[in-house]
Amino acid sequence: MTITFVGHGYVGIVTACVFADLGNTVYVIGRTPEKIKKLESGDPIIFEPGLQEVLKRNLLAKRIIFTTDYNVAIPSSEIIFLAVGTPPKENGEADLTSIFSVAKEISKHLGKHYSVISCKSTVPVGTNRKIKDIIEKNKPKNALFDVASCPEFLREGTAVNDTFFPDRVVVGSDSKRAIQMLLKLHKPLPGERIIVRLESAEIIKYASNSILSTKISFANLVSFLCEKTGADVEEVLDGVGLDKRIGR
């Protein structure tokens, strides 16, 4: 398949390299020419074990192409992933400026064929509906598209392995056609397929992040109590984690 990632940050570059390694033609769109040149030279910009090797292998095979030009990538792409940052504002809300700006730019360059626009970024519930509205208003009249949410679940330090061997693949969309295309793209990968509504996929990502943060906070509290009482934190966490309802 021919796919595009808009954004070459942590999620974008790792996922793009993995899908290229699976035999797809992958475009990566970025805003900064200097970073594009580094990526083209085999420098992944970020450090992640195994990433540079995968990047260089697919540059050599000409399966991954970096560009600043939407018109080079978007018209021929079957699936377009949004992978730009959504940093928090001062009030804690996600800043969706980049997401909506990218959606508008994508819409202007859509080809005549059918495309799936899928959000990889962590976004609040309802964002994908807004993305759909933006694209609908700005696309060429003959462009056909659907929107889907396909959240990532990567860990720093094991992101490449997590992408090659996911626990699950979550696809949220109202469109059966979009779901089938995303399932086709992910077919070489293991993991359970979870097909849900658009909003459910958005909440799955936020809920997963929240549970992981809660577990870390609780483990820190247990560690503090162990220091005060002379208990061994690893023994305690192992003892608690063996409960199948909880996990380590």
Residues covered by each model-derived region:
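Structural/interface elements that position substrates and couple domains in central-metabolism enzymes
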Residues: M1-R248
